Amino acid sequence: MKLTTKSHYSVKALLDLALQPDYGPASVKAIAERQNIPGPYLEKLLITLRRAGIVNAYRGVRGGYQLAQAPDQISLGQILAALEESLEPFPQYGDDQSLAEDWVTLSVWRQLHQKFVKALYSITLADLYYDARSWQAAQGEGINFIV
């Protein structure tokens, strides 16, 4: 699996939302500026995440996007699934001779894939947030809102 720009930017934006006081809404412009993400691209990503129920959108002067659930309830697996990212570590094989010849290798890849997917669904935005804060503290950095 390859982490795409779409996935990377989405996780950065969602972590930014997790940093909002009381998880309140933040505008696309504010998130884009803090995270160095192109605004129009970020808007498309947030629309996709809204349709998947990961964020809520609010209109008006104090509107913007906010997490639909607490950060400890949103996993990396959910985010990637919402973006329709492929989690497949190997090409799809048909029922031909090559599959029979490679069954041992494919079995290992399938087991690794299952463990990988399980790990993605066990890592939450809260985990990433605390990992980032721990790293910053170890580096002697203050609170930094750039993820």
From Swiss-Prot:
GO biological process: regulation of DNA-templated transcription
SUPFAM superfamilies the UniProt entry points to: Winged helix' DNA-binding domain
Domain annotation HTH rrf2-type: ranges: 2-130
One of the record's GO molecular function terms: DNA binding
DNA-binding among keywords: yes
Gene3D superfamilies: Winged helix-like DNA-binding domain superfamily/Winged helix DNA-binding domain
Coiled-coil segments on the chain, per record: none
GO cellular component: cytosol
Alphabetical keyword list: DNA-binding
Top-level taxon of the source organism: Bacteria
PANTHER family tied to this protein: HTH-TYPE TRANSCRIPTIONAL REGULATOR SLR0846-RELATED, WINGED HELIX-TURN-HELIX TRANSCRIPTIONAL REGULATOR, RRF2 FAMILY
UniProt-recorded name of the protein: Putative HTH-type transcriptional regulator slr0846
